[in-house]
Amino acid sequence: MFKPIRTTHPAIKIINSTLIDLPAPNNISIWWNYGSLLGLCLVIQVLTGLFLSMHYVPNIEMAFSSVALISRDVNYGWLLRSIHANGASMFFLFIYLHAGRGLYYGSYNLSETWNIGVILFLLTMATAFMGYVLPWGQMSFWGATVITNLFSAIPYIGKTLVEWIWGGFAVDNATLNRFFAFHFILPFAIMGATILHIMFLHESGSNNPIGLNADSDRIPFHPYYSIKDTLGYTLAISALSLMVLFEPNLFTDPENFLMANPLVTPIHIKPEWYFLWMYAILRSIPNKLGGVMALFAAIVILFIPPLTSVMNKRSLSFYPLNKTMFWGLVASWAILTWIGGRPVEDPFIIIGQVFTSLYFIYFISSPTISKLWDDSIII
């Protein structure tokens, strides 16, 4: 009996089981589009980054000039740079939407997939941070100085660790060189972790909006969801194109158009918008070590939901109080993002502290409230 080559060829059948004949729930919504959109973002970032690296010079005397050269004299260099810079913003926007969907619909119950997703988030943050340093503008230099200096808060080994990261006694040429090397190699680690993420997801099967087992009623991924993903790609590329062609510097800090100067500190040092909520959490604790611990906890706490989940049903749609708290978490995240871009003064300090507390309260109290709801204590 004849079998299609996609089911028999050793290499093609791997692609087939991932993108063509994959059994998928028949009720997944647009919120399940962001995984494939993140794959698209990763490909865009790797390709544009590869071409940019051909013209970039990782040297403190020439880095800023080489970025200016890319923008002015390299054929379509301005386009590559804008796509790469704004593509990072789109990447993080989709990460937050993807993770938010996972929290809302209980996807963290697929613990291996969720934990690798959190590791992917950490790798992406490290990659983006080091990429932000490479243009060697004022905000690049001072951002690198401030963030790497946080490691000095670690007792006993802090000072040694910071100097080891810097490759000297300050952020200098050695720092820029190693950041460029890691910024180039980490996306390939992200690709490897992505393959593991997909592998574990397909081992257990995708979650769905109602959180029930959908094994009895699945449909092939192609053509149903491949068409749906193509629509997502079209909309995402259109949005990115509008940003790149009309407002390429919307998210760029004006300070970064000035070459790095260790003798002049910017009035307000801040990271890119997608790190502002973490920066607000860091600043909300009036102690260096405490702030670093809060920052670390804000990310590591994402490993907690698979361990603390006691819900009888997966989706928060069935838990009105938890659903209200979830949207409170989203509001807290948005307000912390705003606070991270504000000066360190009242009333921004107290607002940051309040919403930092609310951020952590969600993860601590959500399992208890869902358990009480299941036990019918709350009616």
Swiss-Prot record:
A single BP term in Gene Ontology: mitochondrial electron transport, ubiquinol to cytochrome c
Record flagged with keyword Transport: yes
Coiled-coil stretches: none
Residues annotated as binding a ubiquinone: 202
Cellular location(s): Mitochondrion inner membrane
Cofactor(s) it depends on: heme b
Residue positions binding heme b b562: 84, 183
Entry keywords, A to Z: Electron transport, Heme, Iron, Membrane, Metal-binding, Mitochondrion, Mitochondrion inner membrane, Respiratory chain, Transmembrane, Transmembrane helix, Transport, Ubiquinone
One Pfam family linked to the record: Cytochrom_B_C
Residues where heme b b566 binds: 98, 197
Residues spanning the membrane: 34-54, 78-99, 114-134, 179-199, 227-247, 289-309, 321-341, 349-369
GO CC list: mitochondrial inner membrane; respiratory chain complex III
Co-factor: note: Binds 2 heme b groups non-covalently.
InterPro entries (UniProt xref): Cyt_b/b6_C, Cyt_b/b6_C_sf, Cyt_b/b6_N, Cytb/b6-like_sf, Cytochrome_b, Cytochrome_b_C_euk/bac, Cytochrome_b_N_euk/bac, Di-haem_cyt_TM
GO molecular function (one): ubiquinol-cytochrome-c reductase activity
Keyword Magnesium tagged: no
Membrane topology: Multi-pass membrane protein
Note: Heme 1 (or BL or b562) is low-potential and absorbs at about 562 nm, and heme 2 (or BH or b566) is high-potential and absorbs at about 566 nm.
Protein purpose: Component of the ubiquinol-cytochrome c reductase complex (complex III or cytochrome b-c1 complex) that is part of the mitochondrial respiratory chain. The b-c1 complex mediates electron transfer from ubiquinol to cytochrome c. Contributes to the generation of a proton gradient across the mitochondrial membrane that is then used for ATP synthesis.
Alphabetized PANTHER family for the sequence: CYTOCHROME B (PTHR19271:SF16)
Record's subunit section: The main subunits of complex b-c1 are: cytochrome b, cytochrome c1 and the Rieske protein.
Family to which the UniProt record says this protein belongs: Belongs to the cytochrome b family.
Name of the protein: Cytochrome b
Source organism per UniProt: Lumbricus terrestris (Common earthworm)
Gene name of the encoded protein: MT-CYB
